[in-house]
A protein has these predicted regions:
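Conserved PLP cofactor-binding pocket of PLP-dependent enzymes
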Residues: 125-146
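Active-site-adjacent "lid/gating" segments in soluble enzymes
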Residues: 1-67, 74
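Residues within well-ordered alpha-helices
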Residues: 72-73, 120, 136, 142, ...
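Conserved active-site and cofactor/substrate-binding residues in soluble primary-metabolism enzymes
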Residues: 7, 41, 45, 67-71, ...
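Flexible, small-/acidic-enriched active-site or ligand-binding loops
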Residues: 156-204
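Aromatic-enriched alpha-helical interface/lid elements that frame and gate functional surfaces
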Residues: 46-127, 131
């Protein structure tokens, strides 16, 4: 440690270019501009959003399935009750699945619709197959982790007694983020600013 700082040079556009990650690498290595693929991974299959069985109210529901390697794919096929898809030579290796994406993904899409989101998540997590819920906002703020982390803050606002807003994700040990005051009304602090900061007397204000 030198005890000396240094200047950090970072542009917003640079971060966007860096976030291209595998897509950027694909282009730089091959010289080919990748086409649109929605939320599907260009280099890994299956790695995308799938519709699952509807919610109790009949609305559509989804999860993301992120099978990162051949071992995880075999485990997924076991969980899905389709071990034959793990043994099918068209789908054994990831490079095969990428090549045959057009036939495999529709098969998986139908399989995924046979079970609910909670059922899939529990089974896949138990098998250590990467996956994740796609939640609406009601589900986000009902999530036990979101609640335990205090991601909803309550404000006493003149126009709404209990105003709930999204809290700061920063949890600072020594100087925690304060939420003592709600966003001010238009002109709420005009007199205070003119009087205390600019020295205007009541008559001038």
């Amino acid at each position: 440690r030198t005890g000396e700082g240094q200047f950090v040079d970072m542009a917003l556009l640079d971060t966007q270019a860096a976030m291209l990650a595998n897509l950027g690498a694909n282009y730089l290595v091959s010289g080919k501009v990748p086409g649109r693929a929605g939320n599907a991974h260009q280099n890994i299959v299956p790695y995308q959003v799938f519709e699952v069985a509807p919610k109790p109210d009949g609305s559509a529901d989804h999860i993301i399935l992120a099978v990162g390697n051949d071992g995880q794919y075999a485990k997924f096929c076991q969980v899905a009750g389709r071990p034959d898809l793990a043994a099918d030579p068209r789908y054994v290796k990831n490079q095969d699945r990428v090549r045959n994406r057009a036939t495999l993904v529709p098969l998986l899409a139908e399989i995924m619709k046979t079970r609910t989101k909670p059922d899939w998540l529990a089974a896949l997590e138990a098998a250590k197959v990467p996956c994740g819920a796609i939640n609406n906002l009601a589900e986000v703020f009902a999530d036990p982790h979101v609640q335990a982390r205090g991601m909803v803050t309550h404000w006493q606002h003149p126009l709404k007694h209990d105003l709930k807003l999204v809290a700061s994700p920063l949890k600072l040990e020594k100087t925690p983020v304060r939420t003592d005051l709600p966003p001010p009304l238009l002109g709420q602090h005009t007199d205070e600013v003119l009087g205390e900061l600019l020295g205007f007397d009541a008559a001038r204000i």
